[in-house]
Amino acid sequence: MKKWNIYKATREIKEKYISEIVQGCTFFCDDVFEELIKSCDTLEEAREVLKKYKTDITYYSGNTEDCYLITEYCILPEIYDEDGEIVESGDIVEITEMKISVEDEEWNVVKTFDNLKEADDLVHNDERELTLVY
């Protein structure tokens, strides 16, 4: 039986690896925590469920190094046997969008990015007082 599963994946990425923070960076890595959120009978149902979630990026300072905690959601088709065990997984169909905005002093969006490195570079190389929003 085929199901369309919604997964939540969370990964911690050290600030020095900021260029790794792109859409899909949390899936299929060794240092990732994945959680099944919901199992759907159709792709359309799964897409409706996925709309309720969004990618989250949280910056925090650790004891030794600053990090980002990235959480993403995806739709993954999987086939189950008669015992309810997954016997085959397909390719990811859809992932929540990574949308990182850079705003000026008056909260106007200057530019929107799909990765953190380019957004961070703009903030640090522009003369204006810019802020990252994710």
Residue locations for each model-derived region?
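Intrinsic disorder/low-complexity segments
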Residues: 17-31, 96-97
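Short, mixed-charge low-complexity intrinsically disordered segments
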Residues: 10, 34-37, 43, 47-100, ...
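Short, extreme N-terminal segment that most often corresponds to the first beta-strand
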Residues: 1-23
